[in-house]
Amino acid sequence: MINHGNIVGNFIVDDMGNPIATAGGGQSDIIGDYGEFKIGIEVTLSTGMKQYEMEGEPVSRHIGELQKQGPAFGIFIADKLSDTVISHFYISSIANTKVYNGRVDIIPMSTATFVEFFEKAVKKDLQPSDLYQIHEHSLRMSKQFLFEEKTEKDWHKSVISEIFNLLS
């Protein structure tokens, strides 16, 4: 996974190369350019309602702006995901917007889930097409679950399950 794209960290690092702050305004913390598509990775330490207030709109905007350049989706990482953030990202994956050239897909993951995903993805040598398949599944399920009157929790569970199905 990491070896198949051009991965750029926009975060601030110390003299040893360790991250000390997230990216400045207007950009994702990490951008993975896989040629045919990009992934914007956003990381936060915020929790609860503050997580939604601080991250909901900015993360959607960052990924939306990235999507204006071509196919893209986002991964949002937090130690503990706020239910309101999951709901916000579910809704953004349903709504077709002109301003961002379509639906803005952001997949929320807890830090523990992301670490497990990343370790297994590296071990399996996950390909860019596999990553894009996760994005396509997310968009397909958000639309399907809307019509089936399912919730953001159902969508999120389905996407995380798909991720680990690809890795098994």
Segments from the language model and where they lie:
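Catalytic core segments in nucleotide and nucleic-acid processing enzymes
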Residues: 1-167
